[in-house]
Amino acid sequence: MRSNFRIAMVLFAGVAIGSIAVEGLHAQGAKLKAYVVSESDVLDAKAQAAFIPAIRKAMAETHHGRPLYTATGRIVPIEGGSPPASVGISEWDSLDDAVAFYKSKAYTDLAPQRDKAVKVIRRFVVEVEK
């Protein structure tokens, strides 16, 4: 009876250790999500209203982009200096995907429309921690 118990415990331990090892190997290849934050001043509200759907469409169609979460939402300062007039936040499957989009033809083709609508103060990508 004791030997059956020992065999069962050894099998259980082997399965548990194997599961942990497989999970660890899977996590090594996983990319971390990233968020692009764009701070800008609005130059022309009508041009911005036309630009937002265009950039949303380009993000959705290229490089695994997720929707532009906000571009005209309310901004409330908490710490530091004055906030920018407009902030855009978008989610990406990885930092590489985000950078690739902003270097892509789909994005650069929108530059004239963007430059008429907003003046980009700062844009950066933040990779999510593990």
Regions found by a protein language model. Give the residues of each.
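Bacterial N-terminal signal peptides that target proteins for export
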Residues: 1-12
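Short alpha-helical segments used as structural interaction elements across diverse proteins
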Residues: 3, 45, 111, 119-120
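Alpha-helix boundary/capping and short turn/kink residues
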Residues: 10, 104-107
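Terminal signal-anchor or tail-anchor transmembrane helices
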Residues: 10-20
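Short S/T/G/P-rich N-terminal loop/turn motif that feeds into the first structured element of a domain
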Residues: 18-105, 126-130
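Residue-level marker of structural boundaries
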Residues: 57, 107, 116-119
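Short, exposed beta-strand-loop hairpins at the edges of beta-sheets
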Residues: 99-102, 112-116
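C-terminal end-helix/capping segment
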Residues: 115-130
